[in-house]
């Protein structure tokens, strides 16, 4: 088994991941499939600080194509096109809104001290943003945000 998978499984067990998702994690054969599971369980993962920013830094820092961002400073607006985008310890400006080609409005999650400004992409929609403790978001230029707070149990 891969080192990343061993770590994910150990932390999932220690942090009380439900049996169904734990079994799904055991079946993950690639980082991409593990990321999909992470994004499907993102509320639980962020509430429990799973798997931890240290693991994300070490094993998933190259996962921007999958909507996982870590330690990024966006000087120029970064266009967000994923259905779920998770930012760990990120700062700067992102652009979000309706993705007409994919017919989605992204759900944006900020964790581990992320502070982002979100600007619109030209469509009048409301973008949901989920904030962990210690994170902040500012709406800019033609976007409406619906902000939810994720708290540690």
Where are each of the predicted segments found?
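Short, glycine-biased loop/turn motifs at secondary-structure junctions and
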Residues: 1-153
């Amino acid at each position: 088994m891969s080192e990343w998978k061993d770590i994910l499984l150990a932390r999932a067990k220690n942090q009380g991941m439900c049996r169904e998702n734990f079994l799904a994690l055991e079946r993950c054969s690639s980082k991409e499939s593990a990321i999909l599971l992470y994004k499907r369980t993102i509320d639980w993962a962020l509430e429990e600080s799973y798997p931890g920013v240290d693991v994300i830094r070490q094993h998933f820092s190259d996962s921007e194509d999958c909507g996982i961002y870590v330690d990024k400073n966006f000087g120029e607006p970064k266009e967000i096109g994923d259905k779920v985008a998770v930012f760990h310890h990120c700062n700067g400006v992102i652009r979000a809104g309706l993705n007409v080609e994919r017919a989605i409005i992204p759900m944006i999650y900020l964790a581990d001290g992320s502070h982002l400004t979100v600007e619109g992409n030209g469509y009048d929609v409301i973008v949901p943003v989920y904030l962990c403790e210690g994170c902040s978001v500012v709406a800019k230029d033609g976007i409406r945000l619906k902000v939810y707070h994720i708290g540690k149990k």
